[in-house]
Amino acid sequence: MGHKIHPTGIRLGITQEHRSKWYAPSKTYPLLLQEDDRIRTFIKKKYVAAGISDVLIARKADQLEVELKTARPGVIVGRQGSGIEELRSGIQKTIGDRNRQVRINVVEVEKVDADAYLLAEYIAQQLEKRVAFRRTIRMAVQRAQRAGVLGLKIQVGGRLNGAEIARSEWTREGRVPLHTLRAEIDYATKVASTTYGVLGIKVWVFKGEVLPKEEQPLPVGSSPRRSRGNRRPQQFEDRSNESK
């Protein structure tokens, strides 16, 4: 089942967060959902060169919060923050409400080569430049391994290298445990438009397992401490800055 279902959808609330965080009654819910889709489409088309990994949207009363995860924040922010104002006015025009308060937060992706969407975007760019797909996949795997990922799976489907019959090929390096719900799996898809048609790209990145605090593994050679009943928890107060 883990290989059939969407890796992100099955892990929502466990290791993944919702991309849209808001509540609305049943009458306005479809309108706000379409509004989110228009905002994401507008941002992805406007900032193609910014390497946007994800767009998170939150709503609080009349305020709209948009968080952009990007590999190149300077492209969005612009000189002296002029790009933020341009983006804010563009979002207000897209949703058709010039008076809506829009708050924008730009977050830089620390490890670009460990992000599934940015890896898929890199593969799509190379395929559109007519680079052989096996060479492209090998280069993407090397970049991800240098970034320190624990596992990676890449699948490319379509008329590979201009073949008459479409097929799909995939490769995997390391562990990609799709059945383990506590495994942090970053999943993304991308479409590459080539002269022979479109190629579908899927990328799975395994970044580790997220364990609850009570299930954290003990250090090697240590044993669990015995319970001493309902002992009062110790409290420590930092007084290092007090004058003597």
Curated annotation (Swiss-Prot):
Keywords: Ribonucleoprotein, Ribosomal protein, RNA-binding, rRNA-binding. GO terms for molecular function: mRNA binding; rRNA binding; structural constituent of ribosome. Residues 39-110 form the KH type-2 domain. SMART domains: KH. The lineage of its organism: Bacteria, Bacillati, Cyanobacteriota, Cyanophyceae, Synechococcales. This is Small ribosomal subunit protein uS3. NCBIfam families: rpsC_bact. GO terms for biological process: translation.
